[in-house]
């Protein structure tokens, strides 16, 4: 009787040992599979990275392949959202258009002389003072020369404003001042202050600039658009009047076809 009980007890112990060994093997196998899966994910992510990003991985989590990929995906989404934003695109287009309009050449140019050199002077009443480009100032040799070192060479330095600048407009010599700007074109710009002091008038029918009783021919560089920008006709104490075909016939003026039907600023009638 005791021998049978001992045999059954031994059989139960051996069965428990087998079950324990099976559980241990299953646990080890599961850990091994998880480790292999993690290594496979890291290896698969590392294949997407360039070689220079794999040289210094170290132990930091930010430098691991999956962290680098996640960070690049977030940056790419931000760039894509910014690129698809209509507000941002409108701001970019507005900035580009303002930049191109700032460097746009005016419609009326006159030829004059300064320092025995020919200049192309732009007529623009949108600016109060005269303006001269830094490149034109260097070409005329009007830049101040200051020493770079106590015993060194001298180099031209453009001032912020030029006084007593003599311009030969037709048969008249005009002494005026001009502000120095970093714009290459136009070389020189006649502002509203000089135009009013000299009592200059712009004749659209004759395409000429009239100081006093002397006519100076101008050069028109616009094609099929408006002949004169709005700023050229914006004079103080003016009233707004819409020009029609009947008004043009009564005035006897010839206007470019692209300018008809638009509003311009005209001096008040007496």
Curated annotation (Swiss-Prot):
InterPro entries: Peptidase_aspartic_dom_sf (IPR021109). Residues 1-27 have a biased composition (Basic and acidic residues). A motif (LXXLL motif) lies at residues 192-196. GO terms for cellular component: cytoplasm; nucleus. GO terms for biological process: negative regulation of transcription by RNA polymerase II; Notch signaling pathway; proteolysis. The keyword Transcription applies. Keywords: Nucleus, Transcription, Transcription regulation. Residues 1-33 are annotated as: Disordered. Its main location: nucleus. GO terms for molecular function: aspartic-type endopeptidase activity. Expression is restricted to the central nervous system (neurons in the dentate gyrus of the hippocampus, the amygdala, thalamic and hypothalamic regions). The keyword Transcription applies. SUPFAM superfamilies: Acid proteases (SSF50630). Down-regulates transcriptional activation by nuclear receptors, such as NR1F2. Interacts with NR1F2, RARA and THRB in a ligand-dependent manner. This is Nuclear receptor-interacting protein 2. The lineage of its organism: Eukaryota, Metazoa, Chordata, Craniata, Vertebrata.
